[in-house]
């Protein structure tokens, strides 16, 4: 299994997320992709990537056909889509639920099954936490190439968290430090509203670009 950088996995996670939640805006322009990477909602850690940072990683992923440039016709604006999984010749095949779980792990770091059930609501449906646990167990069951790992339960916590392995092995210390900020999130309704606002901002950016292109002609 290829090991990705943190920036690469953030980009892949954003493309997966936007493909599902805002298909009318997908594939994404570089500007929209950078905005998605740096969202303050549904991201942990929050990043401040530049267009150049994102483009460098996008170009590296294009070289490996994990991302493709889907620029059409006479358009002067490049648009990107992922080929992370479920492609005709690719070996990685994922169900909608598996893809949703990995997407949230890519974007928000280690999560409990309960958190994953709540935070995947805009991506897929889970009837209960047990279904999430079954998906996680399946993703971790591959002896030669496990996709996720169950972390040791933290003191005072009811549930153990799971982390993805696409950026390499996860140390308990690193996972704990990265999770600390998200423990202050008070309720998922506010987070969902923030995500909707972020999606609207993306649409506004795309409309601005379209208007500018029309004015230039």
UniProtKB/Swiss-Prot annotation:
Gene3D superfamilies given in the database record: Winged helix-like DNA-binding domain superfamily/Winged helix DNA-binding domain
Coiled coil: none
InterPro entries: DUF480, WH-like_DNA-bd_sf, WH_DNA-bd_sf
SUPFAM superfamilies assigned: Winged helix' DNA-binding domain (SSF46785)
Sequence similarity: Belongs to the UPF0502 family.
Name listed for the protein in its UniProt record: UPF0502 protein VFMJ11_A0613
Species for this entry: Aliivibrio fischeri (strain MJ11)
Organism phylogeny: Bacteria, Pseudomonadati, Pseudomonadota, Gammaproteobacteria, Vibrionales
């Amino acid at each position: 299994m290829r090991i990705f950088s943190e920036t690469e996995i953030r980009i892949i996670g954003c493309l997966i997320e936007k493909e599902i939640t805002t298909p009318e805006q997908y594939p994404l322009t570089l500007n929209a992709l950078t905005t998605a990477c740096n969202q303050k909602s549904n991201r942990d850690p929050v990043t401040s990537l530049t267009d150049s940072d994102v483009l460098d990683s996008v170009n590296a992923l294009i070289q490996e056909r994990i991302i493709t440039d889907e620029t059409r016709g006479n358009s002067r604006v490049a648009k990107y889509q992922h080929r992370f999984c479920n492609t005709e010749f690719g070996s990685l095949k994922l169900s909608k639920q598996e893809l949703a779980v990995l997407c949230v792990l890519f974007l928000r770091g280690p999560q409990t099954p309960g958190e994953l059930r709540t935070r995947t609501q805009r991506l897929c449906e889970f009837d209960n936490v047990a279904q999430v646990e079954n998906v996680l167990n399946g993703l971790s069951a591959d002896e030669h190439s496990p996709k996720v790992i169950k972390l040791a339960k933290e003191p005072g916590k009811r549930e153990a968290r799971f982390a993805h392995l696409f950026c390499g092995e996860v140390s308990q210390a690193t996972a704990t430090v990265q999770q600390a900020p998200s423990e202050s999130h008070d309720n998922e309704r506010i987070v969902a509203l923030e995500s909707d606002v972020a999606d609207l901002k993306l649409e506004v950016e795309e409309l601005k670009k379209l208007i500018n292109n029309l004015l230039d002609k």
